[in-house]
């Protein structure tokens, strides 16, 4: 399959998720000429803001954070070489749910309260429009248990299946996605990245053992080397300035909790549906489009 023929769709919950988990993958395939689409389910209105400059944007104050984060997402995707952002059923249709048990999760517009048939139909429409060869979203736990990530997993899984059938006829002609992946963090790779951290801002701290989410190495099916685009990934992280701070080294970042994390140079995935392409000696793919033909 030629690079220009490749089509990749990523479904993420909030602005910044696309860069933190899959930024290198987006940049790598975009740089190779693939058509990369990022579909974001909410505006991230409930995000915790870093610093005082944007503190008044939060939900309890001006409630303007979501609109501001559209601009951050646009800048991040530009840094990664991807197309302009797309939002599920249009920007603002679904609101960031925050965490389970918080007042924001009870909002009728919260993504966690979405009518599943409506949300699935909206993803089906995008799949049938762009006809991706590869779709990526989260694993069943949403990576770290956030309800919006879990919801994104559920609706994307249902949509990939439904898009190949006669369901939702109003959403276009059926399309069967050849390969469907979950984005994950490999445990040993994360541990090596943390061990390599030697300097970081004095108000940051190293994570406690097991504090950052990861999966067993044996669960990983696919490893994408993103060293060649790591600077683009760092620039995209910096674009999400209300949520992310990149260390002066350019090799680490932290969220509002000031827990330092490595900017990983290999991004990992689990093939959830489809056929594994060619693998290396470790049994892992090195190309999301491996085994596919135009």
UniProtKB/Swiss-Prot annotation:
Cofactor(s) needed: Zn(2+)
Bound cofactor: record note: Binds 1 zinc ion per subunit.
EC code(s) of this entry: 3.5.1.103
Entry keywords, A to Z: Hydrolase, Metal-binding, Zinc
Annotated positions binding Zn(2+): 14, 17, 149
Gene Ontology process terms (BP): mycothiol biosynthetic process
Pfam families, per database record: PIG-L
Gene Ontology terms for molecular function: N-acetylglucosaminylinositol deacetylase activity; zinc ion binding
Catalysed conversion reaction: 1D-myo-inositol 2-acetamido-2-deoxy-alpha-D-glucopyranoside + H2O = 1D-myo-inositol 2-amino-2-deoxy-alpha-D-glucopyranoside + acetate
Family: Belongs to the MshB deacetylase family.
Biological role stated in the UniProt entry: Catalyzes the deacetylation of 1D-myo-inositol 2-acetamido-2-deoxy-alpha-D-glucopyranoside (GlcNAc-Ins) in the mycothiol biosynthesis pathway.
HAMAP family with a match to the protein in the record: MshB
Name of the protein in question: 1D-myo-inositol 2-acetamido-2-deoxy-alpha-D-glucopyranoside deacetylase
Species this chain originates from: Rhodococcus erythropolis (strain PR4 / NBRC 100887)
